[in-house]
Amino acid sequence: MFRTMMRAKLHRATVTEANLNYVGSITIDEDLMDAVNIVENEKVQIVNNNNGARLETYVIKGERGSGVVCLNGAAARLVQPGDKVIIICYGLVTEEEVHKQEPKIAVLDDNNQIIEMLGAEKAGTIL
């Protein structure tokens, strides 16, 4: 049996742009992608802290060091520049791997720079 587990997260990313006329996806600074091991075209879930919207899309590499987090296409209707979002990536693991796998979590500042890397989340933690 396989379980779907969180394996990567960009916590409190700031949306820098929403581009309705783009084909689709989310553009993310490649440095942020590397920090949590998200790859281009990988499926991600996006949770908007400002309005509660949740959506799924795929990732396009953004310019390194730019801090870009741009929702493209129809997803642009669910965010505004300045919104805080959580970008989550899941993976399938076997029963044997469930307790061994450790997610990579990057906590971001208002400019989408990493301020802290976490390997786990604890209940009741406020960031």
Swiss-Prot record:
Keywords: Autocatalytic cleavage, Cytoplasm, Decarboxylase, Lyase, Pantothenate biosynthesis, Pyruvate, Schiff base, Zymogen. The keyword Cytoplasm applies. The keyword Lyase applies. GO terms for molecular function: aspartate 1-decarboxylase activity. Its EC number is 4.1.1.11. It catalyses: L-aspartate + H(+) = beta-alanine + CO2. Pfam families: Asp_decarbox. Is synthesized initially as an inactive proenzyme, which is activated by self-cleavage at a specific serine bond to produce a beta-subunit with a hydroxyl group at its C-terminus and an alpha-subunit with a pyruvoyl group at its N-terminus. It is an enzyme of class 4 (lyase). It is found in: Cytoplasm. The active site is at 25 (schiff-base intermediate with substrate), 58 (proton donor). Pathway: Cofactor biosynthesis; (R)-pantothenate biosynthesis; beta-alanine from L-aspartate: step 1/1. GO terms for cellular component: cytosol. The modification Pyruvic acid (Ser) is found at residue 25. Binds 1 pyruvoyl group covalently per subunit. Substrate binds at residues 57, 73-75. Heterooctamer of four alpha and four beta subunits. Belongs to the PanD family. Catalyzes the pyruvoyl-dependent decarboxylation of aspartate to produce beta-alanine. PANTHER family: ASPARTATE 1-DECARBOXYLASE. This is Aspartate 1-decarboxylase. It comes from Bacillus cereus (strain G9842).
